[in-house]
């Protein structure tokens, strides 16, 4: 977060926006094979939405950050973690 803000301050005068994405636990085929069922259940319990994220859950926020709707944002870290941060 600090690096994102520092770079945004430094590069902003040149019209360069700097934002970051902070995804939570996201299961894809590769990690799914390496995580135990017990660990997966523990992650779900810690998530406000009571499920693990998927790659598709991350696509929307990323598309927002790279699209024109975020033209006024810089120095931000978008947390997409299903509510783990606040649960």
Specify the residue positions occupied by each region the protein language model found.
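Alpha-helical segment proximal to the catalytic Tyr-Lys
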Residues: 9-13, 71
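Conserved catalytic helix of short-chain dehydrogenase/reductases
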Residues: 1-10
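A glycine/serine/threonine-rich, flexible loop-to-helix segment
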Residues: 13, 25-47
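Short C-terminal tail/terminal secondary-structure segment
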Residues: 62-63, 74-87
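Short-chain dehydrogenase/reductase
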Residues: 4-5, 59-62, 66
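Active-site loop of short-chain dehydrogenase/reductase
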Residues: 13-16, 76
